[in-house]
Design a protein with these regions (language model features):
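N-terminal type II signal-anchor transmembrane helix
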Residues: 2-80, 85
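Periplasmic POTRA and POTRA-like interaction domains that precede
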Residues: 69-70, 77-80, 222-227, 301-313
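Hydrophobic faces of stable alpha-helices that mediate helix-helix packing
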Residues: 25, 29, 45-46, 174-177, ...
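An N-terminal domain-start capping segment
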Residues: 30-34, 55-59, 109, 272, ...
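Non-catalytic structural connector segments
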Residues: 273-336
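Peptidoglycan glycan-strand catalytic modules in the bacterial/periplasmic cell-wall system
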Residues: 2-9, 78-272, 294, 326, ...
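Active-site oxyanion-binding pockets that recognize sulfate/phosphate
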Residues: 37, 248-251, 335
């Protein structure tokens, strides 16, 4: 038998085995170094992230120094018979403030059931809502589901008022973090009802209206407390995108959103199945067009000349008697 050949083969196998062990140990060593560096990187990024968040929160305004109540409101002009003939507004002032008890329950729930269904449960930020919005965005590749609570929207509309001018992701990210932080702080010192009241008085509802009372009068020529379920759903539909869901300019878009809001209200048990069906059958948009036609007709009436004269006289008196500048007089007249 050829033992020399077998010994050579065995030695070659042993050599290959040793080489494999060396390579294996080297790979394990490289893997350990890689994992160590990865953990170190994660820890470093984590600390940097915490430092960034701490800096952003530290630079946020104090909850004691902010005001969520808007100062400007619309000015109403009456004739000698105490009949309203015009409403004067400037940018950010076309609102008519009302208390929460003047808002019908179905109007409150029209907003809550769609914009912030856990409003009475969360502490200012809705972690479940954030998770749901993230899941929908990832699965549909369409980040259309909002995660901002009503409290955050109140802060955005009344404290972080320059959010529309944000030109970078970092600016938006910073504002969002401060918004969430202040939302939690605000709910520690402010009741849910007060936050809801402020929200309903400050949201942009299209056609140069702010708040549900101004919107109710603009679209339906009635006070908010007299709105029907169908009409409430129309107004609540606007807030997600005031231009796109404007019931005068884009009634079809608004109708689609309105149907979703009515479904949410029914699912939450805030309207019955019968009320839901009745609301869907309501020819609400024809009424809106009639009101709009009347408003446009009145804006071209002789009253407009009378109103212009009243404005000029009041502004002149404010400047001559009160010592106002032209700008101060203008703001006083048009901002309530």
């Amino acid at each position: 038998m050829n033992f020399g050949y077998r010994e050579t083969i065995d030695k070659q196998k042993d050599l290959v085995s040793v080489q494999r062990k060396v390579v294996s140990k080297s790979l394990v060593g490289v893997l350990k170094v890689f994992l160590y560096l990865l953990v170190l990187l994660i820890i470093t990024v984590g600390f940097l992230g915490l430092g960034l968040l701490h800096g952003i929160i530290k630079s946020a305004p104090s909850v004691d120094d902010i005001s969520i109540t808007p100062s400007a409101s619309a000015t109403t002009v009456y004739d000698s018979n105490n009949k309203k003939i015009s409403t004067l507004v400037t940018s950010g002032s076309n609102r008519i403030k009302i208390s929460l008890d003047q808002v019908p329950d179905h109007l409150k729930w029209a907003f809550i059931d769609t914009e912030d269904s856990r409003f009475y449960e969360h502490n200012g930020i809705d972690v479940q809502g954030i998770g749901r919005a993230a899941f929908i965005a990832l699965t549909t590749m369409n980040p259309s589901e909002g995660a901002s609570t009503l409290t955050q929207q109140v802060l955005k509309n009344n404290v972080f008022t320059n959010w529309t001018n944000e030109s970078s992701f970092l600016a938006s990210f910073k504002r969002k973090i401060q918004e969430q932080y202040l939302a939690v702080q605000l709910e520690k010192v402010t009741s849910k009802d007060k936050i809801l009241e402020t929200y309903l008085n400050t949201i942009n509802l299209g056609s140069n209206t702010l708040g549900v009372e101004a919107a109710s009068r603009r679209y339906f020529n009635k006070k908010a407390k007299k709105l029907t379920i169908s009409e409430s759903a129309v107004i609540a539909s606007i807030t997600q995108n005031p231009s796109y869901y404007d019931p005068i300019l884009n009634p079809k878009h608004n109708a689609k959103r309105r149907k979703k809001i009515l479904k949410n209200m029914k699912a939450a048990g805030h309207i019955t199945k019968k009320e839901y069906k009745q609301a869907l059958k309501d020819d609400v948009y024809s009424r809106i067009q009639k009101v709009n036609n009347k408003i446009e007709k009145n804006s071209n009436s002789i009253n407009s000349y009378f109103v212009d004269e009243v404005i000029n006289q009041v502004m002149a008196d404010l400047q001559s008697i009160k010592g106002y500048s032209y700008t101060q007089a203008y703001n006083a007249v048009y901002s309530g």
